[in-house]
A protein has these predicted regions:
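Exposed loop/turn and edge beta-strand positions of beta-sandwich/beta-sheet ligand-binding modules
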Residues: 43-45, 84, 123
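Helix-adjacent hinge/juxtasegments
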Residues: 59-89
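Core segments of cupin and vicinal oxygen chelate
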Residues: 13-66
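N-terminal beta-strand motif that seeds the catalytic metal site of vicinal oxygen chelate
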Residues: 1-22, 40, 83-86, 90, ...
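A short, acidic/glycine-rich surface segment
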Residues: 35, 66-73, 112, 116, ...
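Vicinal oxygen chelate
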Residues: 1-4, 99-143
Length: 143
């Protein structure tokens, strides 16, 4: 792989309460919150959390979906729900730590899957969980 190709910049997740969602992603998933103070002060429309140095998850309130029609007609009716899940690839240690944190916070997780195909080939292990707003995530590791 080269560094000059397309990269995933961000994914917008529809959430009921952006501050609560940021708390979930920080405390339970272990992601760094961004722009929380600016959101609380009304300076930005939504906060985000950092997935890695190149990718963030935007935590947009549900009521913003109505505004999607002005940008792309018909988008408000489907915004967010055609997505099946988002997969996050981690090291084996981070994978195990995430599963432990989720369980400690009472978040249901699926049994392990083995050998599921993804961007880097077949994963050693993977599992699924959902956030408080119903967004589904897969966690996996290849090492």
């Amino acid at each position: 792989m080269t560094n000059s190709g397309p990269r995933l910049d961000h994914v917008v997740l529809w959430v009921r309460d952006p501050v609560a969602a940021a708390g979930f992603y920080e405390k339970t998933v272990g992601l760094e919150p961004l722009r929380l103070d600016e959101f609380a002060a009304g300076k930005v429309s939504f906060p985000s959390v950092r997935l890695n140095e190149e990718t963030i998850l935007d935590l947009a309130p549900y009521d913003m979906a109505r505004g999607m029609n002005s940008m792309l007609p018909g988008a408000a009716d489907s915004a967010g729900h055609p997505v099946n899940h988002i997969c996050v690839s981690l090291s084996a240690a981070a994978f195990d730590a995430l599963r432990t944190r989720l369980q400690e916070h009472g978040v249901p997780v699926t049994d392990f899957s083995h050998g599921a195909y993804g961007a880097r080939g077949n994963a050693k292990r993977s599992f699924y969980f959902h956030d408080p707003d119903g967004n589904v995530f897969e966690a996996r590791h290849y090492d």
